[in-house]
Each structure stands twice: as structure tokens, then as C-alpha cells.
């Protein structure tokens, strides 16, 4: 749980913005959304594998684009 200390003479809006930013960096909202409903283990594995394939294809595309630019 992110904790911020409100500085002296700091407006509430600024403190709230800092708190929201720290929550975003900690990934709290995405974790809550992920745990909102039960997800079957097979679905979790399937989604993770699809993400890995997508990352791999993206990496290959970047490497291929780099090779094309060298010529």
C-alpha cells in the first residue's frame, strides 16, 4: 500500500495526485482488476503464452527492422 506524507502547506490536490501516481507505479489498480473475477488456471496460462508470443514477435520485428536499415 503506497503511503505518502503530506508536506507542510501542500495543497490537497497535489497530495492526492502524488498518491495516485504512487498507486499507479505500484500497480494496485491493475491487480484489483485482475483479481476482480476468478480466472481459470488454463485461461491464465493461455493468456500468458499469448503475451509471450506477442513479445517474441515484437522483438523479431524490431530486429528485422534494424537489419533493413543497415543496408
Curated annotation (Swiss-Prot):
Protein's gene: rpsU
Naturally occurring in which organism (per UniProt): Photobacterium profundum (strain SS9)
GO cellular component: ribonucleoprotein complex; ribosome
Superkingdom: Bacteria
Span of the signal peptide: none
Keywords, in A-Z order: Ribonucleoprotein, Ribosomal protein
Keyword Ribonucleoprotein applies: yes
HAMAP family registered for this protein in UniProt: Ribosomal_bS21
GO molecular function: structural constituent of ribosome
GO BP terms: translation
Phylogenetic lineage: Bacteria, Pseudomonadati, Pseudomonadota, Gammaproteobacteria, Vibrionales
Family note: Belongs to the bacterial ribosomal protein bS21 family.
Protein name stated in the entry: Small ribosomal subunit protein bS21
